[in-house]
Swiss-Prot record:
Protein name from the UniProt record: Protoheme IX farnesyltransferase
Catalytic activity, EC: 2.5.1.141
GO molecular function: protoheme IX farnesyltransferase activity
The UniProt record lists the keyword Transmembrane helix: yes
Gene name of this polypeptide: ctaB
Amino acid sequence: MTRQDLVLFRPRLALLNGIAAVAGHALVPDAAHATLWVALAGVAILAAGGSALNQVLERDLDRLMERTRQRPLPRGDLSPAMATALGCACIGTGLLVLAAGGPVPPLLGAVALAWYLAVYTPLKRRTSLALAIGAVSGALPPVIGWTLAGGAPGDYRIILLAGIFFLWQVPHFWLFQRRHADDYRRAGIPLFTPGAGRLGPSFHVRLWLGALAASVLLLPAFGLMAPRMAPWIAAVPLLLLPVCRPRSEATLFSCLNAFPPLMALALLLR
């Protein structure tokens, strides 16, 4: 496998998922540092395997899109069987790593993976709401990190953090979809257009970003983030509000990529 073939695993997206797990782990007081690395590695490897299987399932769509036609499967550099084997190997490894924290973390990992592959992936072809539905699986990595550190999965604190990551994903991936709208139309994938009407897309991006900032500002009230840190993290989406214009969407997307690492850092320093 060449360096170019690593796109099968989408390493940057896998790392973002691992960082989200670190954010959840950081919420647990006095959690062991060793399990933090388990959360990062286990979730990232699991996400890499999920990306590989997703590309096997969507290889027909990838051939139609300019952005994805140079991936290993559309190019013919890897067979679907080989890509499936590599994906399953990553998934098995990721689940084994997560099992170091007991049965709950790998169970949650399996649920997130099943939601991504069995719910989001087929719905992506059928409905524009798939983007919001798929965000559920992306909200689970913080919960996995939390349970690895010994937290209960139903605790209100981790539910709040998972909700914040859900709010982050929708504008983040919506902007990504809008940047590649022509590709999506070429492949026949319905575009997510929340509240389409006279208000226009900029209004709805601002609405999601405002909700994200407000949720972050709630964290100190529950003792989940140092009061001095919350305004700085909330500033990431708030500072983007004035530039919510079509020509600024690439900048918005890139800036929103910084949100999970900043959240994880703020929670680690609380």
